[in-house]
């Protein structure tokens, strides 16, 4: 708030200094201060008329507007009927092997491919070693 007061004071001084040489002047300035909670707009209008009598009119209007925020619904995901996340009562059926899902079949297929590749590489290495030792005549 001190920053707005300082800017407002500088505007008033500049308008008064500017209007001292003229017979009539009007100056309008607007400053905007933004924060995460609200937007505050200050508008200063100064009218100075120089004649036999000096009349100075200063009008200050301030408008504050609260920024819109999104609402957060904490119940986006509903709990399951059998949910006991913090009190997990494990039963034996939780550890049974199941082939009823695609993930189980995919994992088993990957394991078979990996074992097959390992056997092929192992056979190749052993065969190379066997042929290398037998060709020398040992």
Curated annotation (Swiss-Prot):
The keyword Membrane applies. Pfam families: Herpes_UL73 (PF03554), UL73_N (PF12522). Keywords: Disulfide bond, Host Golgi apparatus, Host membrane, Membrane, Signal, Transmembrane, Transmembrane helix, Viral envelope protein, Virion. Residues 22-101 are virion surface. Belongs to the herpesviridae glycoprotein N family. HAMAP family: HSV_GN. Envelope glycoprotein necessary for proper maturation of gM and modulation of its membrane fusion activity. Also plays a critical role in virion morphogenesis. This is Envelope glycoprotein N. It comes from Human cytomegalovirus (strain AD169). The gene is gN.
């Amino acid at each position: 708030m001190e920053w707005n007061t300082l800017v407002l004071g500088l505007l008033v001084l500049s308008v008064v200094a500017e209007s001292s040489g003229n017979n009539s002047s009007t100056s309008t300035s607007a400053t905007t201060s933004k924060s995460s909670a609200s937007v505050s707009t200050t508008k200063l209008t100064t009218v100075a008329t120089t004649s036999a009598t000096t009349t100075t009119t200063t009008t200050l209007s301030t408008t504050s507007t609260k920024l819109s925020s999104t609402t957060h619904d904490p119940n986006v995901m509903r709990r399951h009927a059998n949910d006991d996340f913090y009190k997990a009562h494990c039963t034996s059926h939780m550890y049974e092997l199941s082939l009823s899902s695609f993930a189980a079949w995919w994992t088993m297929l990957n394991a078979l491919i990996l074992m097959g590749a390992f056997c092929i590489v192992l056979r190749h290495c052993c065969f190379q070693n066997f042929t290398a030792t037998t060709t020398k005549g040992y």
